Amino acid sequence: MRLHHLLLLLLLVVLSSGSGFTQGVRSYLSCWGNRGICLLNRCPGRMRQIGTCLAPRVKCCR
């Protein structure tokens, strides 16, 4: 019975952690939390886009 609980717990941990990595940055707070800044249209210079800040035109750049 303990093995069933352990396997269920392992399955839940794997599924819950995988869902967080597939989603991009989608808000101002999560952008700032990932050490990014929100800018209109494009990321300048050597910065790259890591997500969007609520609107598709506002990019989260780091």
Swiss-Prot record:
Name of encoding gene = DEFB10
* SMART domains linked: DEFSN
InterPro entries hit by this protein: Beta/alpha-defensin_C (IPR006080), Defensin_beta-like (IPR001855)
Q: Name one GO cellular component term.
A: extracellular space
Task: Using the UniProt record, give the first listed, main subcellular location.
Answer: secreted
Q: Which PANTHER family match?
A: BETA-DEFENSIN, DEFENSIN BETA 4A
Protein name as it appears in the record: Beta-defensin 10
Q: Tell me yes or no: is Disulfide bond among this UniProt entry's keywords.
A: yes
Can you name the source organism?
Bos taurus (Bovine)
